């Protein structure tokens, strides 16, 4: 195992391997129970948010999508357009592979089936995949440490900004995290929703043999950063679920839904 700890955008661009990340954390039926339970927790909260929770609209921007699509499986039913983003070209390439059904694309079918089961019909998973592929209209580079985070790309203000397990990895310290959340709030329409999943008390995680670090966050810090970005916290679901110790050092997860104020 390598002794070096990687942190920040340039390290991700050089060292992050999407396939290693996907096989470690998203091998839904063959992987460790802890990782499966976190995917189930994520899908359940997303389903509630985008069905009975009433979050929907025209445009959703997913910030720091990584190489994953599971976080969009419920959202594609209630948004007209989804924009996916990431810092690293290799993650964007992995997303494009799946969107275009190219050879070697990651097989999400078991996770898609679980999402469909939550909606009441496991058998419509292929229809769900097709709908998501139609709904994702753009794949963009993002850097949450810069203003604007989407660079020169022209995007409409969003009804929802989603960011899952990304900000704590992209930000090396709390000040950077707080500034990044303000930038994300700037992508929202007044009254739009911010939906995020955060690993609490995060120290590092493994991608293959490589160790990546980020910012250590407590629940109170997350809530305060969201409020200071001009958003009201509507739901904060913190649980003691954690990844396998061999893969990730943290203590719990926090799923938050917030709404941007009328004048933020």
UniProtKB/Swiss-Prot annotation:
The organism of origin for this protein: Mus musculus
Domain of life: Eukaryota
Gene Ontology cellular component list: cytosol
EC numbers on record: 2.1.1.49, 2.1.1.96
Cross-referenced Gene3D superfamilies: Vaccinia Virus protein VP39
Functional pH dependence: Optimum pH is 6.3.
Enzyme class: transferase
Catalytic activity: a tertiary amine + S-adenosyl-L-methionine = a methylated tertiary amine + S-adenosyl-L-homocysteine + H(+); a secondary amine + S-adenosyl-L-methionine = a methylated secondary amine + S-adenosyl-L-homocysteine + H(+); a primary amine + S-adenosyl-L-methionine = a methylated primary amine + S-adenosyl-L-homocysteine + H(+); dimethyl sulfide + S-adenosyl-L-methionine = trimethylsulfonium + S-adenosyl-L-homocysteine
Gene Ontology BP terms: amine metabolic process; methylation; response to toxic substance
Chain positions with N6-succinyllysine modification: 14, 97
Organ and tissue specificity: Detected in lung and liver (at protein level).
Cell compartment(s), UniProt: Cytoplasm
Activity regulation: Inhibited by the S-adenosyl-L-methionine analog sinefungin and by the product S-adenosyl-L-homocysteine.
MF-aspect GO terms: amine N-methyltransferase activity; dimethyl selenide methyltransferase activity; thioether S-methyltransferase activity
Binding site for S-adenosyl-L-methionine: 21, 26, 64-65, 70, 86, 91, 143-144, 164
Pfam families cross-referenced by the UniProt entry: NNMT_PNMT_TEMT
Keywords, sorted A to Z: Cytoplasm, Detoxification, Methyltransferase, S-adenosyl-L-methionine, Transferase
Subunit structure as annotated in this protein's UniProt entry: Monomer.
Function: Catalyzes the N-methylation of tryptamine and structurally related compounds. Functions as a thioether S-methyltransferase and is active with a variety of thioethers and the corresponding selenium and tellurium compounds, including 3-methylthiopropionaldehyde, dimethyl selenide, dimethyl telluride, 2-methylthioethylamine, 2-methylthioethanol, methyl-n-propyl sulfide and diethyl sulfide. Plays an important role in the detoxification of selenium compounds.
Keyword Transmembrane: no
Protein family (similarity comment): Belongs to the class I-like SAM-binding methyltransferase superfamily. NNMT/PNMT/TEMT family.
Protein name: Indolethylamine N-methyltransferase
Record InterPro entries: NNMT/PNMT/TEMT_CS, NNMT_TEMT_trans, SAM-dep_methyltransferase, SAM-dependent_MTases_sf
Chief subcellular location: cytoplasm
